[in-house]
Amino acid sequence: MRAFIAIDVNESVRDSLVRAQDYIGSKEAKIKFVERENLHITLKFLGEITEEQAEEIKNILKKIAEKYKKHEVKVKGIGVFPNPNYIRVIWAGIENDEIIREMAREIEDELAKLGFKKEGNFVAHITLGRVKFVKDKLGLTMKLKELANEDFGSFVVDAIELKKSTLTPKGPIYETLARFELSE
C-alpha cells in the first residue's frame, strides 16, 4: 500500500485554504488543487509499504506521539517549491513549527533504522496545489504575492496519523490507518 505520515488540520483552516485556492484559481496556470478533505501536513512520505512495515511504523509513531504535547500552530502565508521562477507546488506555511520539525526529525531517524530513505530539509507546509503549467507567470506571481502573509487561522496539533493513499483517475483517496494522540 502507498502510505505517508501526516498531521490533519481543522475545518476552519480548511475553509480558509479552500478560499485561497479559489482566489488563486486557474486563469494564470493549470493547477491540480488538493481536495478540501485531503489538506494536511506531511511529516514523511513512505511510498509503498507492506502490512508488516505498517505495524512496525505504528509502534514507532505510538512511542513518538507520547513524547510530545498537544500544541497550537498558525497557518500563515503562501510559498512555492522549488522556487518563484519555476513554480511546481503552491503551499501554505506553518508558523511556530519547531515541535512539528522535531517530530519529523525523530520520525525520519527512527524510520531510517527500518531502511527508509532519509530526506533532508523538512519544511512544515500544507500543499494547496500542484502546477501543471503556467499560462501567465506575472499574473500568478502577483496573486501569490498578495497571499504571501495571509493568516489562514490556527489549529491544535493533537495527533499524528499513518495514512493510506489510493491513487484514482479523479485524484488520491486518503484513509487513516492509525491515529496516535499527542500527550495532554
UniProtKB/Swiss-Prot annotation:
The record places the motif (HXTX 2) at 125-128
Report keywords, A-Z: Hydrolase
**Record's SUPFAM superfamilies?**
LigT-like (SSF55144)
Pfam families (UniProt xref): LigT_PEase
Catalytic center residues: H40 (proton donor), H125 (proton acceptor)
UniProt GO molecular function: 2',3'-cyclic-nucleotide 3'-phosphodiesterase activity; RNA 2',3'-cyclic 3'-phosphodiesterase activity
Asked whether the keyword Secreted is assigned, the reply is no
Q: Which InterPro entries match?
A: Cyclic_Pdiesterase, Phosphoesterase_HXTX, RNA_CPDase
Per the UniProt entry, the Enzyme Commission number(s) are: 3.1.4.58
Q: Which reaction does it catalyse?
A: a 3'-end 2',3'-cyclophospho-ribonucleotide-RNA + H2O = a 3'-end 2'-phospho-ribonucleotide-RNA + H(+)
As annotated in the record, motif HXTX 1 runs over: 40-43
Enzyme category, top tier: hydrolase
User: Entry's PANTHER family?
Assistant: RNA 2',3'-CYCLIC PHOSPHODIESTERASE
Q: Return the HAMAP family for the record.
A: RNA_CPDase
Q: What does this protein do?
A: Hydrolyzes RNA 2',3'-cyclic phosphodiester to an RNA 2'-phosphomonoester.
* Family named by the database record: Belongs to the 2H phosphoesterase superfamily. ThpR family.
Name it: RNA 2',3'-cyclic phosphodiesterase
Q: Which organism is it from?
A: Pyrococcus horikoshii (strain ATCC 700860 / DSM 12428 / JCM 9974 / NBRC 100139 / OT-3)
